[in-house]
Amino acid sequence: MAERKTLAATVRGGTGKGAARSIRREGRIPGVIYGGGDAPEPITLDYRELNKLIYAGHFLTTIFDIEVEGAKQRVVPRDYQLDPVKGQPLHVDFLRLKPGATLKVSVPIHFINADICPGLKKGGTLNIVRHAIELKVPADAMPDVLTADLHALEIAESMHVSAITLPEGCSLVATDRDFTIATIVPPVVIAEEAPAAAAGKGKGGKGKAAAPAAAAAPKKK
């Protein structure tokens, strides 16, 4: 299940682009806590701490206890923006979690047993169709990863979502089809050129022309 962490934040006074730039110059990142029937609460967070959490992975499926001026709120990140050039966080949104709440989250898939997959051992290639699956999950038991086992997959076979065991209390958002998760693509076989065809080709791909026949000797009169 998703790991729970503690995050410190402060109340953000100003809003807008100018205030956000000023906050970033101070080494902090603007954010907001919303949902749960309460008013949105603008906050700021430490840049280094937030940057580390984002790039550690599973950020959007991690539950946080955010402490704002001594009061803790249980939240989950719902979105964040990165600088398109530097890759640094610019803003982050958190959703409040109330007891008994249900969320829609995109949970990443982890593929295991590739080393014993018969299709891969025979030269096939793993083609991952989906890297994550959207689920309805209980807020207090949110999975951070799903496991897809490749141990029995043969060449040209596909794995569908029905092959993945979902954690208790979790269900698929899309229930109208058994969609594909991954396939084992057959190896590409390159046919060799026929020897006779290759031998008949000279430089430039053309055969040598036959020598002209000798001219007949003139008849004696």
UniProtKB/Swiss-Prot annotation:
Pfam families: Ribosomal_L25p (PF01386), Ribosomal_TL5_C (PF14693). Signal peptide: none annotated. CDD domains: Ribosomal_L25_TL5_CTC. Part of the 50S ribosomal subunit; part of the 5S rRNA/L5/L18/L25 subcomplex. Contacts the 5S rRNA. Binds to the 5S rRNA independently of L5 and L18. GO terms for biological process: translation. NCBIfam families: bL25_bact_ctc, PRK05618.1-2. The keyword Transit peptide does not apply. Transmembrane segments: none annotated. The lineage of its organism: Bacteria, Pseudomonadati, Pseudomonadota, Alphaproteobacteria, Hyphomicrobiales. Coiled coil: none annotated. It comes from Beijerinckia indica subsp. indica (strain ATCC 9039 / DSM 1715 / NCIMB 8712). This is one of the proteins that binds to the 5S RNA in the ribosome where it forms part of the central protuberance. The keyword Lipid metabolism does not apply. Residues 198-221 are annotated as: Disordered. GO terms for cellular component: cytosolic large ribosomal subunit. InterPro entries: Rbsml_bL25/Gln-tRNA_synth_N, Ribosomal_bL25/Gln-tRNA_synth, Ribosomal_bL25_b-dom, Ribosomal_bL25_C, Ribosomal_bL25_long, Ribosomal_L25_dom, Ribosomal_uL5_bac-type. This is Large ribosomal subunit protein bL25. Belongs to the bacterial ribosomal protein bL25 family. CTC subfamily. Residues 208-221 have a biased composition (Low complexity). GO terms for molecular function: 5S rRNA binding; structural constituent of ribosome. Keywords: Ribonucleoprotein, Ribosomal protein, RNA-binding, rRNA-binding.
